[in-house]
From Swiss-Prot:
Keywords: Oxidoreductase. Can oxidize menadiol to menadione. May work in concert with MdaB to form a quinone redox cycle. Does not appear to require metal ions or other cofactors for catalysis. The reaction is insensitive to heptyl-4-hydroxyquinoline-N-oxide (HOQNO), a typical inhibitor of single electron reduction reactions. Its EC number is 1.-.-.-. One of its GO terms (cellular component) is cytosol. It comes from Escherichia coli (strain K12). This is Probable quinol monooxygenase YgiN. PROSITE patterns: ABM. The keyword Oxidoreductase applies. InterPro entries: ABM_dom (IPR007138), AI-2_Isomerase_LsrG (IPR050744), Dimeric_a/b-barrel (IPR011008). The lineage of its organism: Bacteria, Pseudomonadati, Pseudomonadota, Gammaproteobacteria, Enterobacterales. Homodimer. The gene is ygiN. It holds the Pfam family ABM.
Length: 104
């Protein structure tokens, strides 16, 4: 099982982040039905009010779980992911992806 953490940095302004979240809302149910997908959740900062938290108001962090790299690669080639990428290209500045496996 692989865990993918994708940090998506949007253009400044709440409307850009919301536009990306709206696009995720459209595809999450479909992605969760893909073969090999065990989790797919867009996350945003929680204003916890603690001193040790860093906030990124123009970021979305995707937490994904995939059975294998092959399943992840197939996911990236689906029509709904291609449509998502096209829909958000004006709102997203950059994306950093980490693919993780259990450390112990």
């Amino acid at each position: 099982m692989l865990t993918v953490i994708a940090e998506i940095r949007t253009r400044p302004g709440q409307h850009h982040r919301q536009a990306v979240l709206d696009q995720f809302a459209k595809i999450v149910p479909t992605v969760l039905k893909e073969e090999g997908c065990h989790g797919y959740a867009p996350m945003v900062d929680c204003a916890a009010g603690v001193s040790f938290q860093s906030m990124a108001p123009d970021s979305i962090v995707m937490i994904e779980q995939w059975e294998s790299i092959a399943h992840l690669e197939a996911h990236l080639q689906t029509p709904h992911m291609k449509a998502y990428s096209e829909a958000v290209k004006g709102d997203v500045l950059e994306m950093n992806i980490r693919i993780l496996q259990p450390g112990i």
